[in-house]
Structure formats: structure tokens, C-alpha cells
Amino acid sequence: YFGVPVKSAEFPFADVTGAETVNRWDETYNGDKWRPTTGALSAFVGYQITNDAKTEPTEVYNFEGKLNVGDASVALTKTPSVNYSGTNLVSNSYTAAIPISTDAMTFPSGAEQTVYLFNTGTRDQWRKLNGQAINQDGYRSGQYLAVPVNLGGQDNFPDRIPSTHAFLLQTTASGTLNINYSKLIKNTAVNRGDGTQIVTRSVDSNNNTS
């Protein structure tokens, strides 16, 4: 899952080997939530990308556009009579990391104050888990890691959401997530307490994600 690190940008399909498919998560839709995208991608919206390449691409995507500066207000929706009602996919569209903390993120009434990060893996690995809990040390590929916002950085919980990463939020009522720009911190890879990387992309010293 990913988001653009600018206000708006076309997806750079030619930058990386293979043919990509980009879909947008639509909480309001009843059925397959992953809807085809057309035109420019928007800030703070979560997207899904797949690539038909048989080997892992080594190139870097380049997004051009105006940077997001200042606080962000992100709409969270809760649509009745749809599947996965209240499940919203939000992206970090800043060029710095968002701390998983109550100082950095203010949740609306009705929102679960927990950030869900998708662990390294494929959709097929997620499907085969079929929503089951994993009662073992470590995290399985295709599993979500739930991080309570008041526990970010404690024990084995990561403390930040790097630029371009997307994360799931659950809410029982529509409202607005507020992100405090002054609390942003440096990008790093998202790791467990033991240093093991737990999400799909890592950030290098030049703020590139791969």
C-alpha cells in the first residue's frame, strides 16, 4: 500500500520494470473495495500497486509535484450497508515520517486509536491467512500489525509511518483525522523492537523508498 509524497501526481508507470496496476481503496463502495484509478493520484489517499514482473524491480519511482506542508485534515468515512464499513486507507503524503503518537495524530470521535500496518508480503499471502490471528513470535507475511497510537515505539511496536506508506484506520462514525505537521520526524525503515523490518518498503538516506 502506498501514497504519493506530493499534493497530486500522475503515477510514473515508465520508471520501473514491469506493468503496474494501481487501485484506490474506496470505503463507500459495496463490493470489491479496490477501484481502478484514472488521472492524478491524490494526497493522503491510500492506493494499492501490483507489478507483473517476475523479479523484484530495483528502480525508483519518481513523483513530481508540490510538497505538502502544514497540518493535514483527512476525512474518514463510515458508510452503512457496505462491506468493510468504516475501514479507511490513509497514506503519509509528507516527505517526513508521521510519529505513531497522540501528539502527531488526533483521531475523531468513534475512530479506533490504532494504526494497522501491512506486513511484507503479497495479497495471496494475506488471503491464505483468512483473517486468522498468528499466535507465534514474529509476524507472518501478509498479516496486519496493529499499533495502538499510545504504544508507538514501545516494546516491539514501530514508532513511525514513513513517507509514502499507507495505513488502515477503523471508525464507527465519519469524521476527520488531523495530522500535526510540526511533529513530523525523520524517515527510517519501519522495524520491530528487535530491528526486523516489518513492512513492504524501506527508506534510504536520500529519502527514496523501495
Predicted ranges, named:
Residues Y1-L184, N191:
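N-terminal exported-region signature
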Residues N180-S210:
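Extended terminal and domain-junction accessory segments
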